[in-house]
């Protein structure tokens, strides 16, 4: 009886997946395919339909998420592809707190009467289940951006699928290292590859993973005919980033836990949001099915919005910038953006914790907190 291939762990998958076939003098790394045109008779056909470098990146993400994967020119391009497959008038259930780009897009689609949207508190399981009646799509972001609310994924997915509702999960904050929604029964998993997967703040990419061949074809057509294709150089950079993704994410998560503990004791911080803290309202839910708590810490500053801005402007190690998931620590007051949800507190600062020495980070953060007074 032939032995089965070993089931590798994520740390091994990140390093081994998406490599060229092994042979004498074969390249260890996938080359960058700078081609718009391909000789007839092959599987690609044209540069908008496929690219060997995309395929390598998609193979790596697929191995991590456990589903066939498509890469897109950005996370928003991937998200838009999902919504573009819905029929006119489709009912969408989504979180009332989450990535502002998604909430804005859904608001625009609703205003144009292309979909109807029911925004609910995604951490309130009963409220979500009540909203599922007649829904076509349940869009879940968990943990949410920037409030770090946690959805009970196993329960929500189970009930939605029992009603034949399409379920899509934004897995950007948790990543496949902490939760695998496809294994729970979700139809689609979205990643902003820009963030932890690529991890170096130098590319903008997105991905969708699914085990449903019909969904895959629809999403592939959306990419093909909307032109939301990734560049081969960006795909190559993201693939290189994936090689160190588990190492980076582990270090950043360890730093985040330590900083969350210290921030929760600081007199200039009124509230810390981090599911890893036993005192956090989301802790028990996260602990029940997640394998960790991630590398984002959100906290509210004890002062005005202007004072919170001054905190972010005063740091030397932590960079005052939008985005997250890179090796460097970033922070910002989220309500400085007009499109951010009004339910997010004015003084909430989202801290994307990087891989620096945690003591250097704390010295910098503490000095910045004092500078905001």
Map each language-model feature to its residues.
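N-terminal glycine-rich, Lys/His-bearing helix-loop that initiates the first secondary-structure elements
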Residues: 1-45
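Short, solvent-exposed beta-strand edge segments and adjacent coil->beta transition regions
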Residues: 203-205, 292-296, 346-350
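Short hydrophobic/aromatic beta-strand micro-patches
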Residues: 209, 298-300, 352-354
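A common structural junction motif
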Residues: 226-227, 314-325, 368-373
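Conserved N-terminal alpha-helix of the aminotransferase class I/II PLP-enzyme fold
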Residues: 30-85, 101-110
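PLP-dependent enzyme catalytic core of the Aspartate aminotransferase-like
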Residues: 107, 248, 313, 329-373
């Amino acid at each position: 009886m032939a032995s089965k291939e070993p089931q590798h762990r994520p740390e091994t998958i990140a390093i081994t997946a998406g490599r060229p076939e092994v042979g004498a003098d074969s390249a260890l790394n996938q080359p960058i395919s700078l081609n718009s045109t391909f000789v007839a008779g092959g599987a690609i056909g044209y540069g908008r339909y496929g690219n060997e470098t995309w395929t390598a990146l998609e193979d790596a993400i697929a191995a991590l998420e456990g589903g066939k994967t498509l890469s897109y020119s950005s996370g928003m391009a991937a998200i838009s592809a999902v919504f573009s497959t819905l029929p006119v008038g489709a009912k969408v259930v989504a979180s009332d707190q989450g990535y502002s780009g998604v909430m804005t897009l859904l608001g625009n689609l609703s205003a144009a009467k292309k979909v109807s949207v029911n925004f609910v508190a995604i951490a309130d399981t009963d409220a979500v289940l009540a909203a599922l009646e007649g829904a076509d799509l349940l869009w879940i972001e968990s943990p949410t951006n920037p409030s770090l609310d946690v959805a009970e994924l196993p329960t929500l997915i189970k009930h939605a699928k029992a009603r034949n509702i399409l379920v899509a999960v934004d897995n950007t904050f948790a990543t496949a290292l902490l939760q695998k929604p496809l294994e729970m029964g979700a139809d689609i998993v979205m990643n902003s590859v820009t963030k932890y997967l690529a991890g170096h703040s130098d590319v903008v990419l997105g991905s969708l993973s699914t085990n449903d061949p019909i969904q895959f074809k629809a999403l592939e057509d959306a990419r093909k005919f909307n032109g939301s294709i990734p560049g081969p150089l960006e795909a190559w950079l993201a693939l290189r980033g994936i090689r160190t993704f588990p190492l980076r994410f582990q270090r950043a998560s360890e730093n985040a836990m330590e900083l969350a503990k210290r921030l929760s004791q600081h007199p200039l911080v009124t509230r810390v949001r981090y599911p890893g803290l036993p005192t956090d309202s989301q802790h028990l839910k996260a602990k029940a099915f997640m394998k960790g708590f991630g590398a984002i810490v959100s906290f509210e500053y004890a002062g005005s919005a202007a004072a919170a801005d001054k905190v972010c402007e005063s740091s030397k190690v932590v960079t005052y910038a939008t985005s997250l998931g890179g090796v460097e620590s970033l922070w910002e007051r989220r309500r400085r953006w007009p499109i951010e949800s009004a339910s997010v507190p004015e003084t909430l600062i989202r801290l994307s914790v990087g891989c620096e020495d945690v003591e250097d980070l704390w010295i910098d953060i503490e000095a910045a907190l004092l500078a905001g007074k």
